Amino acid sequence: MNMKKMALAACIVAAGSFAASADQARVNPFLQPSYGTVYDIPPFESISYDDYIPAIRQGIAEREAEIQAIIVNRATPDFDNTILAMEKAGRTLSRVMRVFGALNETDNSPEMEAINAEISPIISAASDEIMMNPQLFAKVKSVYDRRNDMGLSPAQIKDVEDTYTEFVRAGALLSDTDKAALKEVNLKLSDLYLAFNRNLLSATNAFRIVVNDPKRLSGLPESSVAQAADAAREAGLPEGNWVFTLQAPSRLPLLQYADDRELRREMYEGYVNLASSGEYNNGPVINDIVHARARKAALLGYPDYASYMTANVMAKNPAAAEDLLMQIWRPAVKRVGEEVAEMQALADKEGAGITIAPHDYYYYAEKVRRDKYALDEDEVRAYFAIDNVRKGIFTMAEKLYGVKFVEMPEAPKYHPEVKVYDVLDTDGSHLAVFMTDYFPRASKRQGAWMDEMQGSFVDPDGTVQRPIVFNV
């Protein structure tokens, strides 16, 4: 080997050693016994995109080993060695997936989308392997068949029944051929759900209305106009432009107050037709979802997907669910008709020369309210600033339930807009961590919801894990 080749080989070895050392030095927070933070809140600033997939793969491997230990256990299946053991399995996977799921919906990015696309089929396949495992299901069924003769508590019996039902609904009773078909359908659905949500978020962020004539802003509150001006600046537009988006704080005031009817129509149609055409058209995706769901229902012995979904809830069948909806729908339609009649009368009185259309509803509802009750919602708005509302809710919680919410300004948070609270019981002991994240942004899906970033449990050995809840 000549000197150049020897030098090149040495460089390659050195580079490889350096990379290996760097990988070894890199600590994956998800794979540590504890995060080392207050109440074990995820250390968001220390979590890298590169941490998720290795942690998920290791979590899946750990869960598979834990499930295999249940399967090979020669002891007679009982609640502890089967049902409880399954519930305790996969805690590493749950740990990382809860954080990933939370951030994917509240602080999305192209990197998170790429990770989601890679892990979704892996998670789907791994779950199916467990739920359709005949040896594991045999143990579950053994406990289920003897549940009333084992001295179990009512809660334990319910747990056994729910577990058995979950396995059956996941395909545990199917033939090998149908199991294989169901696995394919589940993989397809996981991809379709990803595509649907990706299109929805992309279409929401792509839509905007640019106004460059201040006359078109007539009727809008100053706060709404200022917000639109800020949005225009963020979009790189010069002064004298205003940008309105589909995010609720931008969309709703426009529909409610804008005197420009064409502006209201444009916003309304943009919202109701979201992701219905163009680059982010969800029409074909929805069509594929409907067909895949129908196939899944048929494999599991149901006439349609609605029957599959309602069979395990209080309604029990689609007819009962529809009947409940109609009990609300019919009087609601009647009331809306009465409201629209009032709106039309007011429009006629003002000489508007229009027939009330859907994009007029919020606007004329506000006009009727002012006309009938002299109530200006924009004047009331000042009393309902987010900090005031949050403080009021916390005060009510303390008076009703004795719990206190104490802000933790130094606690880890996944976005600067997030506030973190220590939830204390009446005796001052720690109950939970509560995070609030109430403002819209391009990286967050629309809507309002809550979820757990960390679940709660009490193990038989007395180990307690308190929940970390986020409210969006």
Language-model region placement:
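N-terminal helix-rich structural modules
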Residues: 23-222, 227
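Active-site-proximal, well-structured secondary-structure segments within enzyme catalytic domains
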Residues: 159, 188-191, 198, 202-245, ...
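Short charge-dense sequence patches
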Residues: 33-39, 67-77, 110-116, 129-143, ...
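Short His/Asp/Glu-rich catalytic/ion-coordination signatures at enzyme active sites or charged loops
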Residues: 36-51, 100-119, 141-184, 245-284, ...
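Generic detector of short, well-ordered, non-transmembrane alpha-helical segments enriched
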Residues: 16-18, 48, 393
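Gram-negative bacterial Sec-dependent N-terminal signal peptides
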Residues: 2-22
